[in-house]
Structures are given as C-alpha cells and as structure tokens.
C-alpha cells in the first residue's frame, strides 16, 4: 500500500514536470527543457522501477495510471498559470472603434489596425500581440468595449521587430539601470 501511494505521488510530480518540459521545448527553450528533463527522468525511473518490481501487484499499476491521469490535470492547470509565451488575437470589427484601439495601446498591448473589404461594407481587423499571462486582461478590455467583435487567436513561436520587441528592450534597459543604481 505504501508503494502504491509513493507511485501515485511520484506520478503527480512527474507528469506536470513532463508537461512543462514539453512546453519549454515547443517554445524553443531547450536549455531550460534539458534541466527540467533531468528531474523528469529521475522520477520516471524510480516510479516505473517500483511498478516493474512486481507486475502482479495491481495496486501499484492502478496507482501509476491514476497518478498519471491526475498529473495531467495538474500539469494543465500549472501550464495555464505559468502562461509561458505570447499570443496574437485577430479581432474583426464593423467599425474602426478608436476607443478600443486607444485603450489597448494605453494598456501596453501592441495593436495594428487593418482596413478590409467585407461582403457588404468596409471591415476593420486589429492584430494584437500580448503575453499569454495578460490574455484575460486583453479579453476583458475587448469584451467591455466591443462585445460583438469576432476574435480568433494563435500562439506565437517567435517574433522579431515591432512595438513589442522595442518595449521589451526598453524594459530590460530600465531594469539594468535600476540594478546598477542599487
């Protein structure tokens, strides 16, 4: 029984680590992923080793399977809280909605406005880049000012140039100055 509990706990730890490592690889953060992978590998070997010691012990096998499933739930929760990376939203509007554009820019989001041809009239599209950790804030602003907007989103793997890059460089320089001042 103690072994089954240990296996369950190890799986609850192992699977979220596996989730984080996978996300880091997808985000092209290979060094961080390799570091996390060391811990992941050690936990994997220990827990699977306990299961393989006695394959007739069904409690250990059940603990492994249930722990894996619970670990997936926990891993997904942790991933959402970490919100690593950036996201782009494309927002389609019937009118230009300067109020929305101004509020988004004032809140620090990068916004580009496009004018396009719809079936019956001119349409406007906003491309908005944000850190995933600010996605909820972004959606609240859009839904408050333009609740009927059509939105689609996708994650950004990498980017170069533009407002966001300049803003990040500016913040990094300010942090450097603050660090040297202390």
UniProtKB/Swiss-Prot annotation:
Membrane-spanning parts: 6-26, 32-52, 58-78
UniProt keyword annotation of Glycosyltransferase present: no
InterPro entries tied to this protein: DUF2179, DUF5698, UPF0316
PANTHER family: UPF0316 PROTEIN YEBE
Organism domain of life: Bacteria
Topology relative to the membrane: Multi-pass membrane protein
Protein name in UniProt: UPF0316 protein BCAH187_A3394
């Amino acid at each position: 029984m103690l072994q089954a509990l240990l296996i369950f706990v190890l799986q609850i730890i192992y699977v979220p680590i596996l989730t984080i490592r996978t996300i880091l690889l997808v985000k092209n953060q290979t060094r961080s992923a390799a570091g996390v992978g060391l811990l992941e590998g050690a936990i994997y070997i220990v827990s699977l080793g306990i299961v393989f010691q006695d394959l007739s012990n069904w409690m250990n096998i059940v603990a492994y399977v249930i722990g894996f499933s619970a670990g997936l739930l926990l891993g997904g929760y942790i991933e959402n809280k970490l919100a690593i990376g950036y996201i782009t939203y494309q927002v389609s509007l019937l009118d230009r909605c300067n109020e929305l554009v101004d509020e988004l820019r004032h809140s620090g989001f990068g916004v580009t406005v496009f004018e396009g041809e719809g079936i019956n009239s001119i349409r406007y599209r906003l491309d908005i880049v944000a850190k995933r950790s600010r996605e909820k804030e972004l959606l609240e602003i859009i839904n408050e000012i333009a609740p009927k907007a059509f939105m689609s989103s996708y994650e950004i793997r990498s980017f170069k140039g533009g407002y966001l890059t300049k803003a990040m460089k500016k913040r990094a320089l300010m942090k450097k100055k603050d660090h040297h001042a202390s």
